[in-house]
Each structure stands twice: as structure tokens, then as C-alpha cells.
Amino acid sequence: MDFLMSKHEADAPHLLIVEARFYDDLADALLDGAKAALDEAGATYDVVTVPGALEIPATISFALDGADNGGTEYDGFVALGTVIRGETYHFDIVSNESCRALTDLSVEESIAIGNGILTVENEEQAWVRARREDKDKGGFAARAALTMIGLRKKFGA
């Protein structure tokens, strides 16, 4: 399995898409929307895959640490994944903690993150949100990250 795919051109915003592949087909749809939005905007990106939504914030933190040590610097991040409610409390933990950790990272590190982690009751709701022809939440998250990159630059952060 390739854990890093790259599309990179000079002088364009460069983002890291971190996708949780717990539900492969839904992950494909979210990623398709995010990549299309970034391509349309002329942005470049790398894609890394993680097992689930809880691993997304840590991966972004790894990327930030790597940049501090001479690795790739990213202008922003796109978090993609799907959490579907089951019969246990696990849904609430994953939904709340992944969102909280992304918010903490964005505020504490002053970074642009587009949150495209779907938190839904069932697979039908997930598909409506993931498909580009419906709500296109992958594309929405990518556009949100680009907007936040612009605001960060505007304020000189």
C-alpha cells in the first residue's frame, strides 16, 4: 500500500490530505472531492493514509514536527474520514476527540485545517455527504483549508 502520493508544483499552496480509510469506498469519494477542489484551485498536495479518524490529528502533528526538522512544509491540511454511529459509546469518543484534537491543533499551532471527517448515523447519510454530486464534504473541507490559508496569510500569521 502506498502511504504517500504527491502532486506538487512550485508557487502554489501545498497541502497535506490525511485520509482515514476505515470505510474504503467512502474514503475514495471524500478524497475524490478534495483532490478535485484542490486541482481546480491550482493547489498541490500530498496524500497520506491512516487507519481511522483518531489517527488524523497525530499525523498532522507528525507533519508539523517533520517540517521543523527539514521535512516538507505544508500550507494547510485536509482531514478526511467517516465515523458511523454503532451500538456503543465509541462513536461519541471518536467523533468528539478527533474534532477536538483538530481544533486544538489549528488554534495552538496557527495552522489551516479543513475538517472533512463525517460523523453520521448511518451509511446512507455518509454517502449523501461524501459524493461530489451531493454535499461533496471532501471538496468543502479542501476549500475550507484554502480559505484558512488565505486568512492566515492576510493576517501575517
UniProtKB/Swiss-Prot annotation:
Q: Which processes are annotated in GO (biological process)?
A: riboflavin biosynthetic process
Top-rank taxon of the source lineage equals: Bacteria
> What positions does the entry give for (2S)-2-hydroxy-3-oxobutyl phosphate binding?
87-88, 129
Task: Name the active site residues.
Answer: 90
Keyword Nuclease assigned to the entry: answer is no
Pfam families, per this entry?
Answer: DMRL_synthase (PF00885)
| Gene Ontology cellular component terms for the protein in this record | cytosol; riboflavin synthase complex
- CDD domains linked: Lumazine_synthase-I (cd09209)
Instruction: Supply the InterPro entries for this chain.
Output: LS, LS/RS, LS/RS_sf
Described by its record, this protein's role is as follows: Catalyzes the formation of 6,7-dimethyl-8-ribityllumazine by condensation of 5-amino-6-(D-ribitylamino)uracil with 3,4-dihydroxy-2-butanone 4-phosphate. This is the penultimate step in the biosynthesis of riboflavin.
Instruction: Report the sequence similarity comment from the record.
Output: Belongs to the DMRL synthase family.
Protein name, entry field: 6,7-dimethyl-8-ribityllumazine synthase 1
Organism name: Brucella suis biovar 1 (strain 1330)
Which gene name does the record give? ribH1
